[in-house]
């Protein structure tokens, strides 16, 4: 069985978090679709350090369900994701049907918390006061570099991006598959997800 992933992004999304998610999930046997959240049906986004990426589709044309929806961080990319009504609706439907949803860096606070995707799930995020306050005051602050709470997977930032993507593979395709991908990547000392 082929697992499926939707990796969304916008202008200002973080390059490492986006590319690590796409690459590691593909290595894990996932069929990965990338979607731009930018308006006017744009598929090309300029990421946080200037790299231009063309998405497979614009978020307005997503009409499939996926095993996981992945939201990279970076600013203002996370804010663009939060402003996408289509993405917010997809995430709410994903949670409602018991699907997996994952965010890293700013996105756990800016997207998942601010848009009420989560309720009691514990999350981690980029170490920035406003993001930490949003999770702490909402009772959603977790611990570790990669956190799994229910069907919600979150992580802290660029340095944990590969571990984040491996956690997604592990949660959906199993630990042996994640271990195989980690070995391919020559990761001898990876951060395993912390169950919250």
Where are the predicted features?
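Short, well-structured active-site flanking segments
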Residues: 122
């Amino acid at each position: 069985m082929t697992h499926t992933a939707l990796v969304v992004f916008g202008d200002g999304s973080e390059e490492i978090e986006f590319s690590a998610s796409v690459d590691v999930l593909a290595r894990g046997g996932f069929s990965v679709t990338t979607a731009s959240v930018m308006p006017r049906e744009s598929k090309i986004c300029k990421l946080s350090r200037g790299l231009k990426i063309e998405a497979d589709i614009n978020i307005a044309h997503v009409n499939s369900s996926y095993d996981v929806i992945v939201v990279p961080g970076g600013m203002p990319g996370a804010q663009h994701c939060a402003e996408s009504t289509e993405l917010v609706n997809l995430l709410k439907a994903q949670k409602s049907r018991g699907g997996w949803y994952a965010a890293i860096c700013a996105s756990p606070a800016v997207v998942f918390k601010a848009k009420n995707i989560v309720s009691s799930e514990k999350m981690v995020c980029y170490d920035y006061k406003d993001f930490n306050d949003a999770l702490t005051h909402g009772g959603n602050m977790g611990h570790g570099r990669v956190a799994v709470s229910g069907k919600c997977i979150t992580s802290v930032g660029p340095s944990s991006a590969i571990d984040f993507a491996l956690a997604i593979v592990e949660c959906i395709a199993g630990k042996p598959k994640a271990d195989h991908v980690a070995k391919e990547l020559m990761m001898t000392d990876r951060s395993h997800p912390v169950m919250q």
